[in-house]
Structure formats: structure tokens, C-alpha cells
Amino acid sequence: MARTSFKLEHPLERRQAESARIREKYSDRIPVIVEKADKTDVPEIDKKKYLVPADLTVGQFVYVVRKRIKLSPEKAIFVFVKNTLPPTASLMSAIYEENKDEDGFLYMTYSGENTFGSA
């Protein structure tokens, strides 16, 4: 299971207020929290909070994550939403609408292995 350190560091009310402010100010963007899954050998990401264009695909966002963690091309990376691999062609806006947390953020975890087994 992924660490939820962002949730532990920030109370629900503060996260809700922040996501509401972000969505109001940047209506064409999605507030995303990206955290490394437990027990994976890929590097830790330098920044957890992202403001992603709504029309970005999951595949394009995975590319952003790869760049941020400086992962070499031959290494695999998997990005999960609620322990499921979202389709790479899906728009981030669609994934957000289906999977956003009660605090208004979309939580994604990444791993070097397909740890949850289902595509």
C-alpha cells in the first residue's frame, strides 16, 4: 500500500480548502498528489503536488513523473490510482472525476513494479 504522507502532514480541512482554491483559480487544471509506493526501488520524487492540464493523458503524465525522478529509459514505471493502473490514453480530467479524493485532490502512486497485478 502506498504511503499517504501528504494526507498525514495536512489536515482534511486544509487540503479541501487548498484544492477548492486551486480549482477556482485554475479551472482547466487538475490538482494531483504523486507519491512513491512502498517497497519499490525507483527514486523518490522531488515534488509531490502537481497542477496538471485537464487535457493531458495519463501516458503524458507518466512521462512527467519519469523525468522528475530521473528514471533511465530501460527501467519501467507504473502509476496507480486507487491501486489500479489507469489506461495510458485516458485524460487526466476523466481519471480525476472518477477517482478524486474527498479532499479534492487526485492521489497517484508510482512504482518500478506492477505491484498490484491488474491492468
Curated annotation (Swiss-Prot):
Membrane topology: Lipid-anchor
Reported tissue expression: Constitutively expressed.
GO terms classed as biological process: autophagy; protein transport
Lipid sites, type Phosphatidylethanolamine amidated glycine: 117
Modified how: The C-terminal 2 residues are removed by ATG4 to expose Gly-117 at the C-terminus. The C-terminal Gly is then amidated with phosphatidylethanolamine by an activating system similar to that for ubiquitin.
Residues of the propeptide: 118-119
UniProt-annotated site: Cleavage, residues: 117-118
Its biological purpose: Ubiquitin-like modifier involved in cytoplasm to vacuole transport (Cvt) vesicles and autophagosomes formation. May mediate the delivery of the vesicles and autophagosomes to the vacuole via the microtubule cytoskeleton. Ubiquitin-like modifier involved in autophagosomes formation. May mediate the delivery of the autophagosomes to the vacuole via the microtubule cytoskeleton.
Protein name: Autophagy-related protein 8A
